[in-house]
Amino acid sequence: MEYKRPFGVKIDLETGVIPGAKRIVRKLSDMRGYFVDEEAYEKLLREDPVVYEVYAIEQEEREGDLNFATTVLYPGKVGKEFFFTKGHYHAKADRAEIYYALKGKGGMLLQTPEGEAEWIPMEPGTVVYVPPYWAHRTVNTGGEPFVFLAIYPADAGHDYGSIKEKGFSKIVIDEGGEVKIVDNPRWSV
């Protein structure tokens, strides 16, 4: 039998960068339809800021293997809504995931397909377990980049379409300097 070789990489804990990793950049223009305040979105779109970057170490999509990635989620807002990742279910919905906060301040918004939502605040050292069947999105509620590590099954896949179509049942906003979790006026089952 030929065994896969073990390896190690170093994560820059200050920047979140994994040297040599696959880099994905998500700009505001990649997130049309995700934010509630369309007028604020169009105004900020003129600058088209980078919302987040992902540095992924991916394996072959097969059962039993693991992928891992860091995400650098930048501070910012569209209207009152904090910058967030697109969010997704897993294509193989029965797959779980682990997130570990490295730097900054934010949280994880999770929901079931029926719209039951949970908010888990995150700061450096926080570990979040994402159970199977739960959609998940990270949100930067602070003033500096929010950096975290994600570890997930290599065959989990990503279902972004369900979130793009229906959104999350809750949104995370800045209400007078406080983080508030409120109903998404555009959400539908």
UniProtKB/Swiss-Prot annotation:
GO molecular function: glucose-6-phosphate isomerase activity; iron ion binding
CDD domains, alphabetized: cupin_PGI (cd02218)
Positions with a binding annotation for Fe cation: 88, 90, 97, 136
Location(s) in or outside the cell: Cytoplasm
A single GO cellular-component term on record: cytoplasm
Keywords per UniProt: Cytoplasm, Gluconeogenesis, Glycolysis, Iron, Isomerase, Metal-binding
Alphabetical list of InterPro entries matching this protein: G6P_isomerase_archaea/bacteria, G6P_isomerase_prok, GPI/OXD, RmlC-like_jellyroll, RmlC_Cupin_sf
Catalytic activity: alpha-D-glucose 6-phosphate = beta-D-fructose 6-phosphate
GO term, biological process aspect, one: gluconeogenesis
Tagged with keyword Transcription: no
Superkingdom of origin: Archaea
Oligomer and partners: Homodimer.
Protein name per Swiss-Prot or TrEMBL: Glucose-6-phosphate isomerase
Protein species of origin: Thermococcus gammatolerans (strain DSM 15229 / JCM 11827 / EJ3)
Top-level taxonomy: Archaea, Methanobacteriati, Methanobacteriota, Thermococci, Thermococcales
